[in-house]
Amino acid sequence: MNPELAPSIEAAEREYLRSRVENLAQVSGNPFGARVFYNGDYPCFHVGASSSPMLNRIHGDLVGDPGAVLDLLKGSAQHSTVTPLVGKPSTLGPVAFIEGTRLERLKGWTHLQFVCAIDTMILSRHSFDIEDATAETFALFAEVHASGFHTKPEHRALNQASFAEQAASGRLKIYVLKAVDEVVAGASMYLASNGVAYLGTAATRKSARGLGYHAALIAHRMEQAKQHGCRWVAATALAGSQSRRNLQRAGLRVSHGQALYRLGEGWSAK
């Protein structure tokens, strides 16, 4: 684990996910029931219309004030909120405890966090047509993303709205890759306030996989991060995934592991 960079990587990811929930909360009438609030300096959020661990998280200082995290988990349990624990992957076991209360690790939500300095990245050359999403191509990005991640039809409007930045911060970037004038892949990037460019979601149409589009989107976003003055690039991937291999070829290295935990069965609200 990289003790110096790990907090910055986690902060960048929190900021990225918070921004997506803020986008939902700012839709007129807040139809998705999105809420963002804070535990000290740490953003927390949940979305009534979605049980996704991406959008329902409690953050906080687990060393200095673990009780605050525990209280917020209990107070928002109806939203299936989770909290991330970080460390060496081997230490992130199936069970953890906060002040004696049992937490259980979510299956399929243990990832590696990657990072590299902007001046050590390895940009691969490609000839693909990658551009910033426009009003027209943004909807196509959302379609590709929903298809790639098997988003249920009833959740597709929510998913698309979470990427549609409502504020004028300009921190959330969406890119699309075209082949023969058709959007076949896309990716997001968030320019965090701490100088870290967080490489968010990337997806490719099933019929277009294996052609190098994912690697090209990594390279493009890293190049864009440099142009925006970022000092670091960070990303998340499963340990055995092609995403991990593509990130490492681009110069990113494993910083630490992250696993998501929620309250164990049988906890009492009393």
Q: Where on the chain are the PLM-derived regions?
A:
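N-terminal charged segments
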Residues: 1-75
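Conserved acetyl-CoA-binding loop-helix of GNAT-fold acetyltransferases
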Residues: 65-73, 200, 204, 210-227, ...
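Conserved GNAT acetyl-CoA-binding A-motif
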Residues: 77-89, 225-238
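A conserved beta-strand-loop-helix scaffold within acyl/acetyltransferase catalytic domains
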Residues: 153-206
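Short amphipathic alpha-helix that is part of the acyltransferase structural core
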Residues: 1-23, 57-62, 110-111, 119-161, ...
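Acyl-donor-binding surface of acyltransferase catalytic domains
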Residues: 61-129, 133-138, 243, 259-264
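A short helix-loop-beta-strand connector motif used in the catalytic cores of GNAT acetyltransferases and
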Residues: 28-37, 78-81, 165-175, 185
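Conserved beta-hairpin
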Residues: 36-39, 90, 96-101, 171-185
